[in-house]
A protein has these predicted regions:
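Basic/hydrophobic alpha-helical interface regions
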Residues: 1-176
């Protein structure tokens, strides 16, 4: 890898890490001796994985989401209320993620733009599948689409709408 690309990736890492610290308000006061060891990159993507604009969009969204989780989510409360059932855990985790991302989107429009771009990108990657019944769609995927549509006001594409259509009435009855 050339020195120029390596330098650019290091600057990008610094910028994203600094942005994450500011959003999450996780910076060390000069008078404090505390050293922050939680300054890690989101684990699903690293700077070295960047090879396209889509990767950069995903990385920005992951950093923003990670920062918002740190700012707005209390791990102790989250764990105390975490359901035992695996399916319920997944739905609970999705609802919590939507909650803190929604708070962040209300706080900063740049975060909203980054997250929305990433969700649109994810939806557009998914291919048309054979969807005939509710059993063809995982409840967690449908629930995430429901949360995106109804709380984050993201316009779903036709494939996502079809996936959600099998579950939407059930979610409406349970939530509204």
């Amino acid at each position: 890898m050339s020195i120029k690309i390596s330098s650019l990736k290091e600057k990008m890492k610094q910028a994203l890490t600094s942005t994450k610290k500011v959003i999450s308000e996780d910076f060390v006061n000069k008078n404090e001796k505390k050293i922050n060891t939680n300054d890690k990159l989101p684990e699903t993507l690293t700077i070295d994985d960047l090879s396209s604009p889509q990767d950069f969009i995903r990385l920005r969204a992951e950093f923003d989401s990670s920062a918002l989780e740190k700012k707005f989510s209390d791990k102790k409360i989250f764990k105390n209320n975490l359901p035992k059932n695996l399916s319920y855990k997944t739905l609970y985790t999705l609802a919590e993620k939507t909650r803190y991302e929604l708070l962040g989107c209300q706080m900063l429009k740049g975060i909203e733009k980054n997250l929305n771009q990433n969700y649109y990108q994810i939806m557009n990657i998914k291919k048309e599948q054979k969807l005939n019944t509710k059993e063809d769609v995982m409840v967690s995927e449908a629930f995430e689409l429901y949360l995106l549509k109804n709380f984050q006001k993201i316009k779903l594409n036709s494939i996502s709408e079809k996936k959600l259509s099998f579950w939407e009435n059930d979610f409406d009855k349970s939530i509204k």
